[in-house]
Amino acid sequence: MSVYAVENLPRRWFTGEEHTNMKLTIPSNAEKILLILEENGYEAYVVGGCVRDSILGRTPDDWDITTSASPEQVKELFHRTVDTGLQHGTVTVLMDKEGYEVTTYRVDGDYEDGRHPKQVMFTSSLEEDLKRRDFTINAMAYHPVRGLVDLFHGMEDMQAKIIRCVGDPMERFHEDALRILRAVRFSAQLGFTIEKETKNGIRVLAPNLKCVSAERIQTE
């Protein structure tokens, strides 16, 4: 069975079962966290922007991990942790002076402030967790043995150089208007085109940006 190095991916794109053969290089500490979680009966994957950037041959700024373990269970398994967002299922695990955000699979409730869900519900389903994410290129998870999990065709969109929302763009942008700026930023940084329905959602809901704080806009 062939294994594909990250640097070879831009020359060819993979779909279906070939995702399983994909090999991304992840930090040893991130892999150690995955292993510890799995040895204790939990699922765990690196997820989101780090997977996207690795496939594109870019160096990720950080490595986020998603898991079926609850925040309390994560804290029991690791000696050094920081409660960075327990209400949203996130614990930062410290390894050799590096921090890795470990977040429980979750389903988001209604967004009442255009930024955060009113409540989150933990789930045992990776699919449900990936479904809540903003864009298809950010909704992929990776495991060193099981390979790439790409339920929303993020690889195909990267191949076509497209920014596309996961699910209904109107819902995604209504949940958090800052995603509008994020779509534009990704389009500019990566040279990708914003997909038609996603672009329409931006056009309709752009006025909601007036409710986003200047600090968040500047950070984005």
Indicate where each model-derived feature is located.
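Catalytic cores of the polymerase beta-like nucleotidyltransferase superfamily
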Residues: 2-220
